[in-house]
Amino acid sequence: MIGLIGRKVGMTRVFTEDGVSIPVTVVEVEANRVSQVKTLETDGYAAIQVTAGSKKANRVNKAEAGHFAKAGVEAGRGLWEFRLENGEEFAVGAELTVELFNETKKVDVTGTSKGKGFQGAVKRWNFRTQDMTHGNSLSHRAPGSIGQCQTPGRVFKGKKMAGHMGAERVTTQNLEIVRVDAERNLLLIKGAVPGSTGGNVIVKPAVKA
């Protein structure tokens, strides 16, 4: 399923003809350039590799420079891949724009969530706090028991505990496209999308629409 790579600009609002305010996230979609086409014969699966934006020449290593030169496209800030469905064909060097979503109503948006650093179980996992009084003087935000005793004699993997919060890949599904601005290469998506301002986001047609 083909999507687009964009950059989160920030949030604003637009008004309907009835005067209703709709909160939207603005995603800037610079031209997505196809840097490689993968086929069943050569790679075992069908996909396109795309790059977006630009990168300083002194930040492009020789391997990347050769790869982009072979495709005849400008070096971008990263490489992403989209699987192709039967019948879909793209040429190396082709450009994908926001017009790809002219007929699309709902999208899934993937980004890297804001990093929150080391956080306790209350903030990280929404644990309830313990009593503020009634004899409790030290363990107000402590997580409590983390397991059993000699059986099994260990803490199970995946146990919700304090640790690094955020800075992970997150997908928000079924967001509505409010407007496609082809002139300024902008997508206006209803509601919030993952990540901080300036972060990369992947916008794809919704799988559950």
UniProtKB/Swiss-Prot annotation:
Subunit and partners: Part of the 50S ribosomal subunit. Forms a cluster with proteins L14 and L19.
GO molecular function per UniProt: rRNA binding; structural constituent of ribosome
Protein name (Swiss-Prot/TrEMBL): Large ribosomal subunit protein uL3
Modification(s) after translation: Methylated by PrmB.
Pfam family name, one: Ribosomal_L3
SUPFAM superfamilies found in the cross-reference section: Translation proteins
Residue numbers carrying N5-methylglutamine: Q150
Primary role: One of the primary rRNA binding proteins, it binds directly near the 3'-end of the 23S rRNA, where it nucleates assembly of the 50S subunit.
HAMAP family: Ribosomal_uL3_B
